[in-house]
Amino acid sequence: YGRMTGWGQDGPMAQAAGHDLNYIALAGALHPMGRAGEKPAIPLNLVGDFGGGGLMLAYGMVCAILEARSSGQGQVVDAAMIDGAATLMASTFAASQAGFWREERGTNFLDGGAHFYEVYETADGKYISLGSIEPQFYAALLEILGEDAEHFSKQWDMENWPAMKDRMSAIFSTKTRDEWDAVFEGVDVCYAPVLAIDEVRHHPHHQARGTFVDDGDYWQPAPAPRFSRTQAQLRGPSAKLGEHTEEILREFGFSDEQIAAKLACGAVTGRVDQ
């Protein structure tokens, strides 16, 4: 079976309370995130709870099932969010030790320090994302910039990144986000508009792929990843709290009398709207 905790099953902090933010702080994942000269930026609860926690546990469970097929033996999958978050940081830790990553946040090429890997504000107060790291993408970006390209010829001149970012910010502030969408349409520069939550499901790419499903009352992401043979489907809305308690207990062999007793004493909870 699998089990997941924040701090892990052992260690001096094993029994301490904590939340996603605390786990990624201790794992070294929080400190590098944010702008230069500012405090670390909180990345929602995606890094610890979901990335370092839930996904790592699911991955571990699948690995254990595959191993059991050959060994015939089971085992416990122990997932700690601090371990998972630290694992997600492996490449950054390696870059730091190799001298390719500065300790000061917001000064590296993947944390907003570089002019070619950044989020820029547009004329209408919205934002675009740019990720023109590789030479072919950067060259395409310079073509788009036209006469301004001469100011950005030295892509990896890190000392001049701040100045180049300022100049690029001024350029992108001259058009709206939709106008930049039109400019970059069909050009491989690694570009995408920054979509707000209320916008995301309406984007043509998502609509073409069916990334989101909408039943008229609520919308949510479709199941992912996708399988070629056993396609997942949403059969209905999310269950209400305790909606299937009795059904599940019956599947485990409990009688109606036993279930009623558990509900009466508060050992389990039934539907809260009953």
What is each of the regions a protein language model found here?
Residues 185-206:
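Conserved PLP cofactor-binding pocket of PLP-dependent enzymes
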Residues 257-274:
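Amphipathic terminal alpha-helices
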Residues 115-187, 191:
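Aromatic-enriched alpha-helical interface/lid elements that frame and gate functional surfaces
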Residues 1-2, 192:
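Structural detector of well-ordered beta-strand residues that form the stable sheet scaffold
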Residues 2-128, 132-133:
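Active-site-adjacent "lid/gating" segments in soluble enzymes
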Residues 217-261:
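Flexible, small-/acidic-enriched active-site or ligand-binding loops
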